[in-house]
């Protein structure tokens, strides 16, 4: 049976600062524009994007990551408590910082005359600093206390998530540094630039896994898991749209498809499990009350 956590009274602190809300709101329009260009006008990246993306699935992957970000930041604007969104800023920070690095490394390949490149550069040269500042200042608001009738994520599940995330980070990190083997073996054609962007997207998802595994409160994971569902659904649709460009004769295409579908099933299953857990009980047992105290102590230590 799922462990359901409950607290009495109003949680002090755990606020989302106005500056954090403002930052989240200012990022959303950029992401929506990117989704439109990459997911709807996929064949017009030379005219409408920061660089020409010849493989449509590469464009759809980036658009899917942007969709996850747009959902997350939209929720952040209206979040009631900091811990609902706090864990998601670290993956965003990693994504933005690495995109900035990729931009510098492949600077000559970008279409500097396109307005999209100006927006791209403005976004990725400023976002890492702004997101890091928002997380650093706002993190002190996390009291470590769960929501009313919160659900505790089992330790075993969090250990598995952390292990998968760490393995994924090492693999994606090595491919980011040395993209040649990835280009040779991947499910669709890649260039060095699109290969590195793909690695950054994989790093984003795996940092999510590691960051979320550090907190037992489901309320700290829910928005982020929902964001992953948004991205994974769009990726599945993207595979269907661009299936003729996949290299189905190799294992990478099948492994990619199975991995995406499996991740989507796990995310949807976790949302169902947590919803069911919240519905089972509306008052804590003595054991659950003790678990509230333990989770609060652990999460407060991490947040500080």
Question: For each of these PLM feature ranges, what is it?
Answer:
Residues 2-88, 103, 117, 181-190, ...:
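An N-terminus-focused feature that recognizes amino-terminal "leader" regions
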Residues 17-36, 143-217:
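Surface-exposed interaction/gating patches
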Residues 39-47, 103-112, 176-184, 239-247:
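Juxtamembrane "helix-exit" motif on the non-cytosolic side of transmembrane helices
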Residues 57-74, 94, 193-213, 230:
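Core segments of alpha-helical transmembrane spans in multipass integral membrane proteins
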Residues 68-144, 238, 248-277:
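Hydrophobic, ordered structural segments
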Residues 91-103, 201-205, 224-240:
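Hydrophobic alpha-helical membrane segments
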Residues 152, 279-303:
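Short, highly charged, low-complexity non-transmembrane loops/tails of multi-pass membrane proteins
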Residues 188, 214-222, 240-256:
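Extracellular/periplasmic helix-loop-helix junctions in multi-pass membrane proteins
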């Amino acid at each position: 049976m799922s462990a359901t956590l409950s607290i009495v009274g109003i949680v002090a602190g755990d606020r989302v600062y106005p500056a954090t809300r403002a930052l989240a709101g200012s990022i959303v329009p950029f992401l929506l524009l990117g989704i439109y260009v990459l997911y709807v006008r996929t064949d017009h990246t030379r005219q409408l994007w920061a660089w020409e993306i010849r493989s449509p699935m590469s464009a759809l992957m980036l658009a899917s990551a942007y969709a996850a970000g747009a959902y997350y930041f939209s929720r952040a604007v209206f979040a009631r408590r900091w811990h609902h969104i706090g864990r998601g800023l670290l993956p965003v920070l990693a994504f933005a910082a690495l995109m900035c690095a990729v931009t510098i490394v492949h600077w000559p390949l970008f279409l500097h005359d396109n307005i999209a490149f100006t927006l791209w550069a403005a976004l990725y040269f400023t976002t890492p600093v702004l997101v890091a500042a928002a997380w650093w200042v706002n993190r002190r608001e996390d009291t470590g206390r769960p929501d009313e009738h919160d659900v505790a994520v089992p330790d075993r599940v969090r250990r598995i998530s952390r292990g998968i995330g760490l393995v994924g980070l090492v693999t994606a990190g090595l491919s980011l540094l040395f993209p040649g083997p990835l280009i040779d073996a991947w499910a669709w054609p890649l260039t060095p630039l699109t290969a590195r962007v793909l690695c950054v997207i994989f790093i984003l998802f795996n940092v999510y896994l590691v960051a979320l595994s550090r907190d037992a409160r489901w309320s700290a994971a829910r928005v982020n898991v929902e964001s992953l569902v948004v991205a994974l659904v769009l990726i599945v649709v993207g595979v269907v749209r661009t299936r003729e460009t996949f290299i189905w004769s190799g294992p990478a295409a099948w492994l990619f498809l199975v991995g995406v579908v499996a991740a989507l099933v796990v995310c949807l299953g976790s949302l169902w499990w947590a919803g069911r857990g919240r519905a089972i009980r509306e008052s804590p047992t003595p054991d659950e009350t003790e678990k509230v105290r333990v989770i609060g102590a652990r999460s407060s230590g991490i947040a500080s």
